[in-house]
């Protein structure tokens, strides 16, 4: 069975944490296809700071050394907000016989009940939840705990060989990097070069982004 991983985010900007996390995931799971999915206008997050075109360009630059990583722009190409359930339905229509795995952070898991039609997501894809140590002490919503009790299975073969319906928690490494922090540091003219791919850093400076 063809296995597909979908890593969604604003990538505003894409940073080394995104890349290192993805490399760790691929080293452990080895998905046949791995897509970075830039969101258009997340319904439960503030609007992005860079334009859609700029965010895609930064992704292209960041992924140049990694030809196995692809970019999927279907959310940017839609006129509607970035509702993940619609995106997964679109993937499922295109890849009817493949396993789909949506990669989210542990914070995303805790916020899952806030997602539009979130109950449908587990029927459309598996969930690969990246463990974030700082969230471990937060109470898990009852609805999410019910999902974990019913669907959690940390066997990677389940993700690779089942169309949907499993939740796997995986420690992909801890990287103290966030797009929010990078934007704040750039605005304060602090050095962020070590947290960004070189080509992305050069692009941000050239475009004078996040000033």
Swiss-Prot record:
MF (Gene Ontology): ATP binding; nicotinate-nucleotide adenylyltransferase activity
Pathway: Cofactor biosynthesis; NAD(+) biosynthesis; deamido-NAD(+) from nicotinate D-ribonucleotide: step 1/1
Keyword Nucleotide-binding: yes
Gene3D superfamilies: HUPs
Membrane-spanning segments: none
Reaction(s) this enzyme catalyzes, per UniProt: nicotinate beta-D-ribonucleotide + ATP + H(+) = deamido-NAD(+) + diphosphate
Top EC group: transferase
Keywords: ATP-binding, NAD, Nucleotide-binding, Nucleotidyltransferase, Pyridine nucleotide biosynthesis, Transferase
SUPFAM superfamilies given in the database record: Nucleotidylyl transferase (SSF52374)
CDD domains (alphabetical): NMNAT
InterPro entries: Cyt_trans-like (IPR004821), NadD/NMNAT (IPR005248), Rossmann-like_a/b/a_fold (IPR014729)
Record-stated family: Belongs to the NadD family.
Summary of the function given for this chain in its UniProt record: Catalyzes the reversible adenylation of nicotinate mononucleotide (NaMN) to nicotinic acid adenine dinucleotide (NaAD).
Record's protein name: Probable nicotinate-nucleotide adenylyltransferase
Lineage: Bacteria, Pseudomonadati, Pseudomonadota, Gammaproteobacteria, Legionellales
Gene name of this polypeptide: nadD
